[in-house]
Amino acid sequence: MSNQDLINNKSKAGLTYAKAGVNIDMGNAMVEKIKPFIRATKRAGADAEIGGFGGLFDLKAAGFTDPILVAANDGVGTKLKIAIEVGHHNTVGIDLVAMCVNDLLVQGAEPLFFLDYFATGKLDPEQGAAIVSGIAEGCKQSGAALIGGETAEMPGMYAEGDYDLAGFAVGACERSMLLPSKNLTEGDIILGLSASGIHSNGFSLVRRIIEQNDLKWNDPAPFDPSNNLGVALLTPTRIYVKSLLPIMRKYEGVKALAHITGGGFLENIPRVIPSSLCAEINLSTINVPSVFSWIAKQGKIEETEMLRTFNCGIGMIIIVGQHTAEAVTQALEKNGETVTPLGILTKRQDQNKGILYRGVLHL
């Protein structure tokens, strides 16, 4: 055998990054697929072009004069397992953006830009493009530019077909408009904005109920016969930015917001009110969506557990002054929101209780 033959054989047997499970060409193919989605998120301050080592944003071009930057990051949780098993990937990106930008909104901030982290064991460009299309849609719904992200192909880290997502959002608020306000007081009105569904919390419990009842994702949804179970549960998280931000800027009486995520009312409302006040909530006023009634019944879940795990139909809380409540309610309804008067702020009697429930959930 000649020396050249030895070299050729050695070359054929040699390892490559692709043979180790990381295909750079696949990554490049995905980038080409997602560029149109990303360009569609262009806004003042960002050109929504990718490819640099860092994403750029011109804060001055966004029109702020004395801004405070606000940052948030989050994920989608085990709702992703349903998307993976159903093969429906184009809405979980909306969830990812929603979980971040709704948190920015609570501080009074306008979402400016978003970055994502997508990790998988083996990159499928079609799957990846579907995911990023959802992220771009969430960015459009919230007015944020998608200025960058990371796609990580990590063989051996994830089971076949599995992936995980994380999102990072940055917004800005004029210093004088930061929330919560320092003038929250007894008698302030608590309003609730309807959720679009389960949103992105509690899915480990939902999946356990599905398993215990031997249900299949393509079964008709018991709470929504027009959809199969998997698609119905994947209804994306509602993004409240475009309906709520103009109202927050117009009415000084908007004093605080709370994004109802993991922990429900109990964990989230006390985070935005002073320790001297208590949020008194009348549960009987909530029009509980049928999906939550179904979950409670199938899982034999008590009301207290439902309230600390799920949003139970209310995705965002707004606390407003008494004299502003009617005008804010009408403005929100005009912007397409369903508003529920939930209660009032009262003087806290027990220092360990920032929330007091009245009535019962109609599950």
Curated annotation (Swiss-Prot):
The keyword Cytoplasm applies. InterPro entries: PurM-like_C_dom (IPR010918), PurM-like_C_sf (IPR036676), PurM-like_N (IPR016188), PurM-like_N_sf (IPR036921), PurM_cligase (IPR004733). Its EC number is 6.3.3.1. Keywords: ATP-binding, Cytoplasm, Ligase, Nucleotide-binding, Purine biosynthesis. Its main location: cytoplasm. It catalyses: 2-formamido-N(1)-(5-O-phospho-beta-D-ribosyl)acetamidine + ATP = 5-amino-1-(5-phospho-beta-D-ribosyl)imidazole + ADP + phosphate + H(+). It is found in: Cytoplasm. Pathway: Purine metabolism; IMP biosynthesis via de novo pathway; 5-amino-1-(5-phospho-D-ribosyl)imidazole from N(2)-formyl-N(1)-(5-phospho-D-ribosyl)glycinamide: step 2/2. It is an enzyme of class 6 (ligase). The keyword Metal-binding does not apply. GO terms for cellular component: cytosol. GO terms for molecular function: ATP binding; phosphoribosylamine-glycine ligase activity; phosphoribosylformylglycinamidine cyclo-ligase activity. Signal peptide: none annotated. It comes from the Bacteria. HAMAP family: AIRS (MF_00741). PANTHER family: TRIFUNCTIONAL PURINE BIOSYNTHETIC PROTEIN ADENOSINE-3, TRIFUNCTIONAL PURINE BIOSYNTHETIC PROTEIN ADENOSINE-3-RELATED. Belongs to the AIR synthase family. This is Phosphoribosylformylglycinamidine cyclo-ligase. The lineage of its organism: Bacteria, Pseudomonadati, Pseudomonadota, Alphaproteobacteria, Hyphomicrobiales. The gene is purM.
